Amino acid sequence: MKIAFLLVFALMCNLVHAQQAQTILDASKFLPGPPEDTSVEYLNDLTQYDWGKTMRNTPTWQNASTDMYYQLSTYINAFSPIVGLQISKTNTPNIYLVLDYIMTYGQNAIQQTNSSFGYVRRPYVRFSDHTLVPNIENQYSNISSYPSSFAFMGWLTALTLIEICPDKQNDILARGYNFGTSSIIAGFNWNSDVVSGRLLACAYSTVLRSHPSFNNMMKSARNEYEQKTGISNTIMSSDPNSSSFPNDNLPKAQYLPEPPTLESVLFSYDLNQHILNSRKRATIEGKTARADVDDSADYMAEIFSTAFGRTISQTETPNIYNLISKVNQTSAPAYNDAKESFSRVCPYVLLNQKTSYEADEDYYMNHGSYPSGHSTEGWLAAMVLAEINSENAEDLYARAYQYGQSRVITGYNWQSDVDAGSLVASTVYAYLHTCEEFLKMMDLAKSEFNGSTGIKAQFDNNHQTKSPLYKLDGTRVEGTPSNTGIYIQGNKKIVIK
């Protein structure tokens, strides 16, 4: 039995790992890049580095040093107590397989991204300083710090696990977020590395879900968790006539740090970003920002159609349009809860200024700005569309990033509001994958995009499964296999004679 499991485990790893070369994103198209030494962003990095050193060895951040060991066991040890199960190859083989896969996938993705931005010195290298973990300093000294691999893997693991264990979602997200903060405290990353690392994780969570084999692995992991705990992790369909998906149990934004106070140096960064971006209002970018005040489903369909590669409309792509429309009406409780909790004042209100779009000023006068709802809606739409068409993911994320920045330009949001909004979007996206109705509509949208009106029959031992067939080297088989032999389908080994 053990030998059989190890064989299938190895075959599945080979299969999914073989897909990596096809789906590594060019993150330079949608990440802002490392800041220049003379920029406000870099001054903020310096401030955060100094803050991190004051947090070392404090009770709150006692895990900061252990979080710096970039290996599967680190994440298993961090999340097992939260999940309530000892994650291991023998106790939870399906969950373990998922984490092993995203670890290997993530290493490849972050290495490619690091190289695309060039070498950025880590804080301890720049200042000839020491970290919390001196024994691994040499290992990382020649590896670029941007974006943060620790923030990336922590957030990607959290997004994956909340789909498997949605009943633990808030604690999982808090722990995943803290991996990035730990890397600042330990001295291995700048704040800008961490912000971009988490954003990169948001992007790759959709790339992973565009693979049928990964979705099958996730289904097995979800079933395993439910069998082990007796806790249902599937949201059944709601009223099909409802304008939104079930959203009573969306992840709470309690994993987010409190927004910067007026006395903090972090607020100085937000203020400088506000001043710099307000100067763009008379430019083409400023014109786009004024149009981007619209957060309706129709506007989302319009602005993402070019990046998506197909017109999104009720007449041309009704299944995709209906999915985006329903997603657009779903996420508000996730960010409104945080807005009410933090009650942060919008820039134009605090500074007694005008925005570049005055028509909305009265409406947002008494609304909290943190996190940005527009940023959440834009990133969520982009993530859903990127799962349907992963080949255009980079362009979709570039437009989502611009849509968020438009809120800083118009004066309705601070930069930290916008950064937080993208994270909220990623948690809602993961949550939606526990919703039966969302998954059905996603399948219809994918079929529509691929030019199919029905579900294509694929081979398995009964020749009726929906899953594609792969050779052992990871090559996908189109149509009927021409040769006998062993194939992989879903998470099963198939023998065709």
PLM regions: where:
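C-terminal tail/sorting-segment detector
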Residues: 486-497
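Bacterial Sec-dependent N-terminal signal peptides
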Residues: 1-19, 237
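Hydrophobic alpha-helical bundle signature of multipass membrane enzymes
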Residues: 19-186, 207-213, 223, 227-410, ...
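Catalytic phosphate/nucleotide-handling subdomain of diverse soluble enzymes
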Residues: 202, 426-428
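Residue-level detector of functionally pivotal "anchor" positions at catalytic/ligand-binding pockets or at interdomain
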Residues: 452-473
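Surface-exposed, short loops/turns at beta-strand junctions within beta-sandwich domains
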Residues: 480-483
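Short acidic/histidine-rich active-site segments
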Residues: 188-192, 198, 411-416, 422
